Amino acid sequence: IAEFFSHWPVIAICTLCVICGPLGHWRKDFVDELVGSVVMIVTQFSAGSWVGAGGHWQKWGWHAGGVVLADWIVGGPHVNPAVTLTNLALGKLRYAEFLCRVSAQFAGGILTFPICRWFAKMFKLPMFGGPTFDPAKVSFAAALWDEGVATFILCCAIFLLNWELPVRKNYLAKQSLTAVVIRFNLEMFSSSGCAMNPMLGTCWAIFLSSEAEGGRYAFPGDPSHYWCYWVAGFTGALLASLFYSLCSGTQFFG
């Protein structure tokens, strides 16, 4: 444990948490995002590896159940910097709350993958994979496009299912439909690994660095990582916010 907390990416994110975590009445949001990120990763990433390994449809079913369960357990946290950015753009939260939530999301991500590795080794389970792309197999342009479009579709679905459509009043129905949208994106826009979540892309990359020779946790050194998961992802989220703003009359960064 001491060695884990000696790596500078872990120190940086923990420092951000210390600064942003106690922000007044947003403490509950911080805890919800932290716990929600942990639950989301465990319940959704384990589908097809720890549970539902018997076939494609079983994997789909367990993943959908994980989407619903993760949201229900914690009470609907964002668990995604791109989604949190859309709420900032549409005036639903302030900059300080944005930082508070994102720091908690990162803390959850950077802690959960090593914990899952330890759990998998202890119970002799296969370690699940995460969102990544191989430049030798996938063009950079394709990865950018897929990540941006998938994030755009996810955010539009969240707006419609949670704020506009009648189904928003039925929790199980709207979360199940959200799971369908996520699975659709995973199948159709896979060039980037389809994170649809900058935190997942970067925390998984940090975790993979510890699996390499030397075992050091490090932020990705390739700029293409940040272009794909952050620039493309945030662009998709902001375009979805702008589109929703134009359709609903809501101010965009007003």
How would you name each of these model-derived features?
Residues I1-G254:
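Membrane-interface helix-loop junctions and terminal tails of multi-pass membrane proteins
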